[in-house]
A protein has these predicted regions:
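Alpha-helix termini
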Residues: 105-110, 173, 273-279
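Conserved core of the sugar-phosphate nucleotidyltransferase
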Residues: 126-256
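A short acidic, often aromatic-flanked loop/helix-cap motif at beta-alpha or helix-coil junctions
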Residues: 91-96, 155-157, 195-197, 291-292
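Left-handed beta-helix
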Residues: 2-9, 218-322
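Short coil/turn connectors at secondary-structure junctions
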Residues: 8-10, 58-59, 81-82, 109-112, ...
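Conserved N-terminal catalytic core of the sugar/cofactor nucleotidyltransferase
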Residues: 2-15, 21-32, 37-134, 151
């Protein structure tokens, strides 16, 4: 997203490393759900790239995946430079994946805003998505800010982490005439709750699901990693330094396993939020664009709706629930 006014560079990072076993038997390990056409004709990762296109050119997009999905992702997303499709040598959760992109870009373009987007999400209202992401980019570029997208709970779900929202700091009017984008300070991140706690969170009204979409500048995340997970910094620095050289694959394979296997939520967001609502510079924006994470057949079922025989039918998935 380059405009003459703010000239903010935006680089989306698509996370496509999951092994997709929750959609077994349709998504055996070699064909994880990201590369399946679970809804419509395009695969989930193709849909993810398409909805990012208004905000970023394909040449600016990065994909973090694994060795067995790399080839199929390169086939499905030929617009993305192959040098931007990075295959983790081992699974290390989301903190090293997010931080790797930040360390790579920090070397040359530290003010670039990175957006983290899981590849198994479905978004019904892409215009609203584009608008919320644009607001998030602007806020992430304005300083040492971390932006998280929160989903208003529709049920006391125990499968997601929750974000406890604090002070309402602004309501941006939007050019397309949708409802204003509300920006809250984040008070705390809460782990996946038990059923009783989830009911309490939903009743309280100021808790939203952590949808796993984040925005921050390369410098902000790299600096936060050095502060909160310092042992991760040296391996990632070494990998970033080797990027674009013949040694890259060897350095990646040697250094990446040294990174702790930890989510970015635990590694950075929870630790940073401990500084307090006014000092952590973490803000939540609403993921009010018809979000679903399709993490399992149950959420696909909810997303597609039911026919009168309570069988969910979709062109790409006909008969799977029959």
């Amino acid at each position: 997203l380059m405009s003459k006014e703010n000239a903010v560079k935006f680089a989306p990072v698509i996370l496509a490393g999951g092994s997709g076993t929750r959609f077994w038997p349709r998504s055996r390990r070699a064909r994880a759900k990201q590369v399946l056409a679970l809804e419509g004709q395009r695969t989930m990762i193709q849909q993810t790239l398409a909805r990012l296109q208004p905000a970023a050119q394909a040449s600016e997009v990065w994909v973090i995946t694994n060795s067995w999905l790399r080839d199929v992702i390169e086939q499905q997303l030929p617009e993305i430079p192959q040098s931007h499709v990075l295959a983790e040598p081992c699974a290390r959760n989301t903190a090293p994946a997010c931080a790797l992109a930040a360390f790579l870009l920090e070397r040359t373009e530290p003010d670039t805003v990175l957006g983290v987007f899981p590849s198994d999400h479905v978004v019904a209202n892409t215009k609203r998505f584009t608008e919320v992401i644009a607001a998030g980019i602007k806020l992430a570029a304005a300083g040492d800010n971390i932006i998280v997208l929160g989903v208003k709970p529709t049920r006391p779900e125990t499968g997601y982490g929750y974000i406890e929202q604090g002070e309402l700091v602004e309501q941006d009017e939007t050019p397309l005439g949708f409802k204003p984008i509300t920006v809250h300070r984040v008070r705390r991140f809460r782990e996946k709750p038990d059923a009783h706690t989830a009911e309490r969170f939903v009743a309280a009204g100021n808790f939203v699901w952590n949808g796993g979409i984040f925005l921050w500048s390369a410098r902000t995340l790299a600096t936060a990693v050095r502060e909160h997970v310092p042992d991760m910094a040296a391996p990632l620095e070494a990998i970033a330094a080797a990027y674009g050289t013949p040694e890259f694959d060897a350095v990646f394979a040697r250094e990446y396993p040294k990174c702790e296997n930890i989510s970015v939520d635990y590694a950075v967001l929870e630790r940073r939020s401990a500084k307090g609502e006014q000092r952590s510079n973490i803000y939540s924006l609403p993921a009010d664009f018809g979000w679903n994470d399709l993490g399992s057949w149950a959420s696909l079922h909810e997303h597609l709706g039911e026919d009168d025989k309570t069988n969910v039918m979709d062109g790409a998935t006909t008969g799977l629930f029959a």
